[in-house]
Structures are given as structure tokens and as C-alpha cells.
Design a protein with these regions (language model features):
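Surface-exposed loop/turn motifs at beta-strand-loop junctions within extracellular Ig-like
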Residues: 119, 592-596, 741-743
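Feature activates predominantly on carbohydrate-active enzymes
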Residues: 99-324, 365, 369, 468-472
Length: 766
């Protein structure tokens, strides 16, 4: 018996001896700390654990207590008394670390956890790190973290003009930012579609400008303007007392709120309330959707306009103590200024050569006022037009060019380019996602964002303050939808702005995120599951004229099941293991069965193997900047496009006709030629007027063998793909396609007169 007990002890000892020690890769903190060393042992949280805090950190202790109560239902004692008899405690402490105010140290030992910083802010960030460690387990790995952010500006934006978001959600949104150690909330309070901030000197801004007619039964771009006799009922606004409450709530979490008061454009809600500050005098109504171009702007030739705006900014600054005030400055269509006698007189008086310089005058005048009040101006990168205001900070959204220009001229910059930072873009396959404004920005692409452009020198790079994610709400009508568009992309953005570039690793991030979703689930956050969806791609072998199929997910370790006949996959369907050669045309469907009983949405694509696969394409015209897809072989790779023009399967030409010539390599019997076209009315994408097919034996002399007219009405607003086909029954080596563009958008279109797109995916030769 004693021998058996001895053997048991030896086996247990050997088990622990052979158990692998945890390393940094098993710690699932987001954003990833910049310095971390794993220790030995664990701190075990229990109901008797005390939270001890130094002077001034009582709120921090309360935050931590609440986080722990949420995770483990322990209501821990908090105290500012520390004694030598204390065991199993968490100590929050402000002390001299010879570091910056955002740096913190987190030291986890078997008997205690210590969070230290030079400032309460740093302690708060340490608490956010500990919060994530505690949520996953009561047993917390011993470690030491010394951490600080890479960038001083770490932000998220929220548009509450297009759809009003209640105060409770705004606070919840601030909590989201705090969880990821972000420090700036860019609050887009006003725009054409609604004024959301109470200004006591001008009550009609909220009495009139905060409300519009309800067109919730229509998509954003289909909404008709307010008709005579209709009563605006949709909207809302924040009282000044509510704003003060929100500002304090954010400050308690070390988040600065930067308000945005749009000018000189995007101001139709304000002009509806006070039309005398426009160029035409109105009348106006608050639009329930977006109509392009947005013609109205504040009159730059009227001094009363500036008095009006300065009064508004004065009340705004009384509510928001932020260093910065955002004045917009984007997308100002200057038609009204060109037609306005007062604006033209202003240009003459100030010796301004054009309306761009008039915009510069406008921004500089507002900046001078803000500087006189001890504030700094931020504007979208259009404020560069006509000359930048002396102390302005540029928010670069139209790519990085504006940010580069501003930084090279010595101005501070916040990077937020559409291609990496616009969270209103689709994050997955359009056919699987709720309707969005357009674009395509998956989680992994957000993570790959580098805010400092390579074009900048080390000295110029110092002007890049940081970056932010933008949440424009045209297609985000509810708070749960807002959460869906924000999460989990906010986690990727948080790591972009916090973690040093050399420590970032996409695979490591996705591994940590897989664990992090438990916290999101427990917080009941409606995060997108798009990272689990299967992406089906193809590789064209132009030598063997074969198509190889690949399947992948953004999430790690997928269990992908697929079918080739268009039926829904089950757990018993073939498991995807490696790329495979497609033997015949297929309607491929795939589902990722992940995390035990969960499954992704069903992905699908169609690949058609035809006589033109991998043929040589010559003399083709397509936009080689916006819609490159797979280049010359895109129309002969067998892959059909989805309903999303940005899925990488579509090519297009704007304003001009489409033509292409295909060399089959040898003379073949051709029965039929088809080509797929996309119609998306709201994105100015239309079917062609007609399709003509020509054939040739030698590539020199072509004959027309078929022509078909499009019969679908030009104003059809559904998004769909239409194949136009010609039965030809001919022998040919060369096939030539001609499709005529409608040229410009019809008069019924919101963007009438603009050059229209003709988009095509595959030429199918049978």
C-alpha cells in the first residue's frame, strides 16, 4: 500500500515536471503588450481576495471590483489600507517609474498582483489588461508586463447624425473603447441628415434640424425627399446635460471626446433650421437619405454666417474640454459659392483666385477663432485644398496622400484611410452580410494597417499621431447593427495603434481573438462572425488550362465541409484538406463547422469550365486602377462574380464601351458565347445596351455572328447578375466581344449625368 502511494506521488511529480510551461503565446491579451515575461506559478482569485489602492485610485478599485464581479460573481473588498498581513491581494499604485503617463506595469505573483504607473491613467490601462486575464480563469498565470502605447492618438468614430444613437449606447460605446485602451472618441454629431447637439442660443437646430421624415422602409439611397405636408418624426438629440454626463463618463475612463461640427458643407440640417446662413436662402428640408452631389453649404461671403458658427462653437467648447474641435471640411461642392454674389465678392475682397482658396479662407477664419479660445482645429483632408490653416491637424481619409502631404509640411496627422479604417464597409461576402454602404474591409486587412507611410522620414513620421476606425451610419440604423460593424474589427484597430510594429503577428492575433470572443459573448456584444465564413478562391493554371480551388477562413483551425453540386454541406460532407483541381463545372458550397456546435454562414461560388478557359486575352479595356481583379485572365478563369463589385471577380469600364478579343489557340467549334454583367443601380453600375459577338479564323478579319439587346429597364434597382448570350454555331479561333455602355446615369438617378459603369465577370464559350 505504501509502495502504491509512493508510486502515485512520483507519477504526479513527473506529470507536473513534464507539463509545458506557459509562454507568451498562451496569454490572450488584446491589444498585445509590448513587453511581457512569463513567471512561475499562478495567482488564484477567490472571494477573500482584497483590492488595495493608493490615494486617488478609489474609482479604479471600484472598476476592477465590478469587472471581477461580472466575471466570477465575487464581491471583493476594496480598501486603501495595506498591512504586512495582507495575502492574496491586488494592489493599485501610482509611483515614480520614470516613464510616460500611459505606461503601466502589471506584476502577477502567487500571493499578489500589483499594477503600477506614474499616473491614474496608466493604472486604468493595467486594469484593462488584468480584466482580460481574470475573465478567462480564476487561476492567473504569473507574469510581468511593462507596457505602453505606440501612438498617442488611438481612436474610434461614431456617426449619430444619420441615425440617432441613445445616450445609453454612447456610454456603452465608450466602454468598448476603454476595454481596448483607446483614448479618443470622435463624435460625429451633425451632418445633413440630423443635428444632434442642443445649442441654447439657436433652439431650432434641434427643434427642426434634429428631425426628418421616416423612410425606414427604404434603403438609404432609395429614400425620397420630404414632401409638402409631411411631418418629420424620425430623429433625436442630446441635451447639454446629457452631453456633460457622457463627457464625464468618458473622462472617468480616460477617453477624450472630440466633437465634430461639420462646416462649410454637410450642413443641410442646420440650414433647414436657419436658411439665412445659406447662399440661396432656402427653404430646405432635412434629407432622409443621401443625394449626390450635396450642393448646399454655409455662405462664406456672409459675416453673419461666421457669427452663427462661432456662437455654436462657443457653446460646444463649453461642453467639451477637448484640446481638439473637429470642423469637418469634407466633400464641399462649391457650386453655390460660384453662383453666390456674396461669396464672389468675398473672393474679390480677399484676393482669392478660386473657390478652393475660399474654402481655405473659411477654415483659416474658423481656426483663428478656435485658437483664440485655446483649442486646435481638426479637419478631413479636404482642408488641404487652397492652403492649410497654420495649426490645423489633418484627418487623412481619402487614402494616405493627404496625410503624407500634411506631415511633410509639418502638420500633425491622424490616419483613417477608407481602405483600412472604414468600418461601415462590408467585412465579409456581400451575399452573406447585412446591407452596407459598399467597399470590402475584412478583419485581417484592418490588422495589416500601418499608420506611418513609408514615404515619410523619421522626423516627418513624428507628425503621425495615430489612427482611428470610422463608423458612418447611413446603413447602420440600430445599436445592435453598430456593434456588428464594430466588432471584432475594433480589436484589430486597437492592436494597430497600441502594439509596436515588430511585435504584430496576424496568426498570433487570430489565435488570441479566438479566446477573446468568450469575453464578447459574455458581454452580449453582437459581434460579426464573418471571420468564420469560408472564402472560396481559384487559381488558374494558364499552361495546363486548369482551375485549382482553395478554401480558407480568417479564423484559425477551420473545419470546412463542401459540396460541388449546389447542395448545403453537412458535417458528413467532404472535409476540405488541401487545394484541388476542378474536373468539371461546379456550384461550390462550403460551411465551416467551428467551436463544437457552431457553424458559419454558407458560402458559394460557381466555376464554369468552358472552351475559353485560360485563353489569351488581347485588346481588352477595363479600369486598371479600381477593378483590376485577376488582370487579363479574369474573364477566362471560369469564376463567376457575386453581387459585390468589390469581390475581386469583376472588372469594369466607366463611361466607355467594353471590348475584348480572345485567342483560343486553335480553331474550335463554337455554339454559344455568353458574358455576365452586373446591375447595381445605386452604385451607377448598369447592364449594357447590347452585346455583339464577332469571330475570326486568323485574328485579322472578323465577322459579326450575333447581337443581342438588353431588355431589362435601366432603372431596375435590384442588384443582380445577368448573362447576355449569342447562339453562333461557327468555327473560330478568335472571339471578339463588344458591349455598349449606356454612357451616363439616367436623369432619374441621384447622380444623374455621371459616367456609368459597365461591369463584367466571365466570357463563357461553349
Amino acid at each position: 500500500m505504501k509502495i502504491n502511494n509512493f508510486l502515485t506521488i512520483i507519477l504526479i511529480f513527473l506529470f507536473y515536471l513534464s507539463s509545458p510551461a506557459k509562454d507568451a503565446n498562451t496569454i490572450t491579451i488584446i491589444p498585445k503588450p509590448n513587453e511581457m515575461k512569463i513567471g512561475k506559478g499562478n495567482f488564484v482569485l477567490n472571494p477573500s481576495t482584497k483590492i488595495i489602492y493608493s490615494q486617488g485610485l478609489d474609482k479604479h478599485a471600484a472598476f476592477l471590483r465590478d469587472y471581477i464581479k461580472f466575471s466570477h460573481n465575487f464581491n471583493l473588498l476594496i480598501t486603501d489600507k495595506i498591512t504586512e498581513t495582507n495575502k492574496n491581494f491586488i494592489y493599485l499604485n501610482v509611483k515614480d517609474l520614470n516613464s510616460n503617463s500611459e505606461e503601466y506595469e502589471l506584476d502577477i505573483q502567487p500571493s499578489k498582483i500589483m499594477i503600477s504607473s506614474e499616473s491614474p491613467k496608466g493604472v486604468f490601462y493595467g486594469i484593462q489588461t488584468l480584466r482580460q486575464l481574470i475573465h478567462s480563469s480564476k487561476k492567473i498565470q504569473c507574469l510581468k508586463i511593462v507596457d505602453k502605447p505606440r501612438f498617442v492618438y488611438r481612436g474610434m468614430h461614431l456617426d449619430v447624425s444619420r441615425h440617432f444613437m441613445p445616450k445609453e449606447f454612447v456610454k456603452k460605446y465608450i466602454d468598448f473603447l476603454a476595454m481596448y485602451k483607446m483614448n479618443t472618441f470622435h463624435w460625429h454629431l451633425v451632418d445633413d441628415q440630423g443635428w444632434r447637439l442642443e445649442i441654447k442660443k439657436y433652439p431650432k437646430l434641434t427643434e427642426v434640424g434634429a428631425w426628418r421624415v421616416d423612410r425606414g422602409d427604404k434603403t438609404w439611397r432609395e429614400r425620397e425627399p420630404q414632401k409638402p405636408g409631411e411631418v418629420p418624426t424620425y430623429g433625436g438629440f442630446y441635451t447639454q446635460e446629457e452631453v456633460k454626463d457622457i463627457v464625464k463618463y468618458a473622462a472617468d475612463r480616460y477617453i477624450t471626446i472630440i466633437p465634430e461640427i461639420e462646416m462649410p458643407g454637410h450642413c443641410l440640417a442646420a440650414l433647414t433650421a436657419y436658411p439665412e446662413y445659406s447662399c440661396t436662402g432656402g427653404p430646405f428640408t432635412v434629407p432622409p437619405g443621401t443625394y449626390w452631389p450635396p450642393l448646399e453649404a454655409f455662405c462664406a461671403g456672409n459675416d453673419k454666417t461666421f457669427e452663427f458658427l462661432e456662437d455654436i462653437l462657443t457653446e460646444t467648447m463649453e461642453l467639451f474640454p477637448s484640446k481638439y474641435i473637429h470642423i469637418g471640411g469634407d466633400e464641399v461642392v462649391k457650386t453655390r459659392w460660384k453662383e453666390c454674389p456674396k461669396c464672389q465678392e468675398r473672393m474679390k475682397k480677399e484676393n482669392l483666385k478660386d473657390e478652393n482658396e475660399l474654402q481655405s479662407y473659411f477654415v483659416k477664419r474658423i481656426e483663428k477663432f478656435l485658437v483664440s479660445k485655446g483649442r486646435k482645429l481638426i479637419g478631413w483632408d479636404e482642408i488641404l485644398e487652397g492652403g492649410l490653416a497654420p495649426e490645423a491637424t489633418v484627418m487623412s481619409w481619402r487614402g494616405t496622400i493627404g496625410g503624407i502631404e500634411a506631415a511633410k509640411s509639418g502638420h500633425d496627422v491622424i490616419m483613417t484611410p477608407t481602405s483600412y479604417c472604414y468600418f461601415d464597409y462590408y467585412q465579409g461576402n456581400l451575399e452573406l452580410e447585412p446591407i452596407a454602404i459598399g467597399g470590402y474591409l475584412p478583419l485581417t486587412k484592418v490588422y495589416q494597417f500601418e499608420p506611418i507611410p513609408e514615404e515619410l522620414s523619421n522626423e516627418e513620421a513624428k507628425h503621425i499621431l495615430g489612427a482611428q476606425g470610422n463608423v458612418w451610419a447611413e446603413f447602420i440604423p440600430t445599436t445592435t447593427h453598430a456593434e456588428y460593424m464594430v466588432f471584432p474589427r475594433i480589436a484589430a484597430m486597437a492592436e494597430v495603434v497600441w502594439t509596436n510594429k515588430n511585435l504584430k503577428d496576424l496568426k498570433d492575433f487570430m489565435s488570441r481573438l479566438a479566446h477573446h470572443t468568450k469575453l464578447l459573448d459574455d458581454l452580449k456584444i453582437n459581434y460579426a462572425k464573418s471571420m468564420y465564413d469560408v472564402k472560396i478562391t481559384s487559381i488558374l493554371d494558364t499552361i495546363k488550362k486548369q482551375v485549382k480551388v482553395e478554401m480558407s477562413t480568417e479564423a484559425l483551425n477551420p473545419d470546412i465541409r463542401y459540396t460541388l453540386d449546389g447542395t448545403e454541406p453537412t458535417k458528413k460532407s467532404p472535409k476540405y484538406k488541401e487545394p484541388f483541381i476542378l474536373k468539371k463545372s461546379a456550384k461550390i458550397h462550403a460551411i465551416n463547422f467551428y467551436d463544437k456546435n457552431k457553424k458559419s454562414k454558407e458560402s458559394s461560388t460557381e466555376i464554369v469550365l468552358h472552351k475559353g478557359i485560360a485563353s489569351i486575352v488581347t485588346n481588352i479595356n477595363y479600369d486598371k486602377k479600381r477593378y483590376i481583379a485577376k488582370g487579363l485572365y479574369n474573364i477566362v478563369d471560369g469564376v463567376r462574380g457575386s453581387l459585390n463589385q468589390n469581390d475581386g471577380k469583376w472588372q469594369g469600364v466607366q463611361g466607355n464601351d467594353f471590348f475584348a478579343t480572345i485567342d483560343l489557340g486553335e480553331v474550335k467549334n463554337i455554339k454559344k458565347v455568353s458574358i455576365g454583367f452586373l446591375q447595381n443601380y445605386h452604385f451607377s453600375i448598369f447592364l449594357p445596351r447590347d452585346l455583339e459577338v464577332l469571330t475570326s479564323l486568323d485574328g485579322k478579319e472578323f465577322k459579326s455572328v450575333g447581337k443581342v439587346q438588353n431588355t431589362i429597364p435601366i432603372d431596375e434597382k435590384k442588384i443582380f447578375v445577368k448573362d447576355l448570350s449569342c447562339d453562333i454555331n461557327d468555327k473560330a479561333r478568335f472571339i471578339q466581344i463588344k458591349a455598349s455602355n449606356i454612357g451616363v446615369n439616367p436623369d432619374t438617378h441621384p447622380d444623374k449625368g455621371f459616367k456609368s459603369w459597365l461591369m463584367f465577370d466571365e466570357i463563357i464559350i461553349e
